[in-house]
Structures are given as structure tokens and as C-alpha cells.
């Protein structure tokens, strides 16, 4: 008789989620670098949440980037997972990031929020300026 419960091998743990999140962020950061972006920060944590990536765009905008890793595009993809509540949180976090990094970052463009949908084979979609 097996010494584990059925389905135990499929249990998602915080460590697994973090590892998958890191993989998605690594793939997104590589994609951004190839596209001419400069990644300025990763995993900016506050009590309000986390910004996945902050990058200066080739046009000198400052982009606050939410990375969504999904194993299948059939579930609506990562972009569909970012609704109004998540956008409000990202805007709050962006303001906090700017307060803490005001001296160290220079950009001549605007501010925006992007979403990058990542799957097992890499970046599927990059939506610029969702806000």
C-alpha cells in the first residue's frame, strides 16, 4: 500500500510557486533585455505586495511589469489574470518604488504598467501600457 495520499505529487507549495515565478521572471527579463529594455529592479517587496520587474524602455519610459506564468494559454493567459484590483495594487507599488528610488533612476518618458504572459516555451505576449 502506498505511503502517500492520492494526488500528493501534484500538491502546489509556496516553494513551487516561487520557483515557477522565478522562472517566469527570468524568461521575461531575458526577453526584455533582447528587446532593448534595461531591467532596473526585480521582486520589489513591500507590505502591499510585490512588483515583479521595473525596467527602462528603449523609448526611456519607466515600465512596471507584472509577469504571469501560465502552463496553458487556454486558461485565458496571464494578461486576463490582471484585473482592476491588481492594477490598483501595481500603481500603489509603483509609487512606493518611485519614492524609494527617486535619486537613483532617471528617465525622460512616462510611466506605464505592462503585463508579460509567459509559458513553458517563453514569452507568449507582452502588452504594453495596460495603464
Swiss-Prot record:
Pfam families: UPF0102. It comes from the Bacteria. InterPro entries: Restrct_endonuc-II-like, tRNA_endonuc-like_dom_sf, UPF0102_YraN-like. Transmembrane segments: none annotated. GO terms for molecular function: nucleic acid binding. Belongs to the UPF0102 family. This is UPF0102 protein jk1180.
Amino acid at each position: 500500500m502506498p505511503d502517500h495520499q492520492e494526488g500528493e505529487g501534484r500538491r502546489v507549495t509556496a516553494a513551487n510557486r516561487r520557483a515557477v515565478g522565478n522562472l517566469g521572471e527570468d524568461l521575461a527579463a531575458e526577453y526584455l533585455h533582447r528587446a532593448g529594455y534595461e531591467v532596473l529592479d526585480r521582486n520589489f517587496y513591500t507590505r502591499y505586495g510585490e512588483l515583479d520587474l521595473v525596467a527602462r524602455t528603449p523609448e526611456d519610459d519607466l515600465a512596471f511589469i507584472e509577469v504571469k506564468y501560465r502552463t496553458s494559454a487556454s486558461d485565458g493567459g496571464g494578461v486576463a489574470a490582471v484585473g482592476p484590483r491588481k492594477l490598483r495594487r501595481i500603481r500603489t507599488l509603483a509609487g512606493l518604488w518611485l519614492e524609494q528610488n527617486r535619486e537613483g533612476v532617471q528617465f525622460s518618458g512616462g510611466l506605464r504598467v505592462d503585463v508579460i504572459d509567459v509559458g513553458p516555451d517563453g514569452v507568449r505576449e507582452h502588452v504594453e501600457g495596460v495603464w
